[in-house]
């Protein structure tokens, strides 16, 4: 009986530890993934770049994107 209780407690502790680690590990965001309001955690080969959105001169929001490192993006007309 004691062995069953001990085994149950050990299994409970292991499952709790695994769940806690899974919550702490955030998956990285892939290329061109949009995250609003705050920079996200982009994958290691990417960089987070944020832009403000304006309407009639007032900022209405902010978007952050995961983009390739070292690549320059230009606006096309």
Curated annotation (Swiss-Prot):
Signal peptide as annotated in the record: 1-20
Species of origin: Lycosa singoriensis
Xref: InterPro entries: Spider_toxin_CSTX_knottin
Maturation propeptide residues: 21-26
Example of a GO MF term: toxin activity
GO cellular component terms given for this protein: extracellular region
Keyword Cell cycle in annotation: no
Keywords: Disulfide bond, Secreted, Signal, Toxin
Tissue expression: Expressed by the venom gland.
Transmembrane segments: none
Protein name: U8-lycotoxin-Ls1l
Protein family (similarity comment): Belongs to the neurotoxin 19 (CSTX) family. 08 (U8-Lctx) subfamily.
Localization terms from the record: Secreted
Keyword Repeat: no
Post-translational events: Contains 4 disulfide bonds.
């Amino acid at each position: 009986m004691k062995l069953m209780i001990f085994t149950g407690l050990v299994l409970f502790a292991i499952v709790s530890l695994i769940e806690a680690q899974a919550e702490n590990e955030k998956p990285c965001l892939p290329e061109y993934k949009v995250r609003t309001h705050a920079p996200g955690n982009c994958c290691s080969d990417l960089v987070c770049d944020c832009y403000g959105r304006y309407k009639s001169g007032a900022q209405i929001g902010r978007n952050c994107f995961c983009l390739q490192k070292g690549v320059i993006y230009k606006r096309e007309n």
